[in-house]
Structure formats: structure tokens, C-alpha cells
């Protein structure tokens, strides 16, 4: 665990509203977080983690237990976070279907709720015809917004994602401007 993990571990992070059906944030480590989600009428949690973080099996069991305790459906939609493993359109369509077919609100997260979560939300919003400028703006505002987000793997993953799904040159230029601003 690193110092930057402390706010995530103890639930001191925001739960961000994407739209009326979807909320986003980080993994659920504490009972207080799942209680906050229940209070926001969340009926489904979508976990994007692929098991790469230390302690993941225990944390996954804990999160599943919390969901069961609060009668919230827990769904795994594993997504690797590496530059050469950008999911195909089918993956994003399946996650979008999970959200759209849920009768209540869904909460989606990876470990920190930034990169993988941001990419899935970008594709969810793209499927809903949200303005591309807003999608890209949110991708940076909630995902790649700190110097540490632009280390090699994170930045290469972002570029690969943008080139594949949002290939307009202006989006790639914006990514480079954000990187220069923070690095």
C-alpha cells in the first residue's frame, strides 16, 4: 500500500454522478462506502478490477460481502489496465448493457476509479451520443488529472484508447497538452 491509497481505503473519496443511472468512484473497501451507495439507491456494483493489485482476492471477497449485506448486485467485468490490452467494442457494449438493463442505479469502479473506470464511462457516454468534448473533458477531469497519471503505462494506455475510440487529432493534442501541464 502507498500513501496515496489511504483516502481510497477509508472511503474519503467522492461518489460522482455520471447520469441518472450511473455513479462512479473507487473500489469499495469500507462498509461506510457501501452504505453511502445504498443511500443513493444503487442496486448494482460493477467491478472492473482484474486482480493486479496486492490483496485483491481479499478485497473482492469483502466487497462482495458488503454488497450481499446491503442487497446490492455485484458484477465483475474485469478489464486489464495495460497499454496493449485496450478492450474491444464488444467488451464496452457488454458493460453498457449491464448499466442500461439494471432497473436501478449502477456504481462502477476499478481500483482508484480513474483510468479503467474513465474509459468505460467514455464508451458508455459515446453509446448514449453524449458530446465528445464533454466525454474527453471528463476523461481528464476524473482520470488523468495528476502527474502520476502520466507515467509511461498510464499515458500509453490513454493514447491507445484515444487512438482506437476517439481518434480525432484534437483529442490527441489535448492529451499531450494535459501531460505537459502536469509533468
For the regions a protein language model found, what residue spans apply to each?
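Cys-dependent protein tyrosine phosphatase-like superfamily
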Residues: 1-107, 112, 119-183
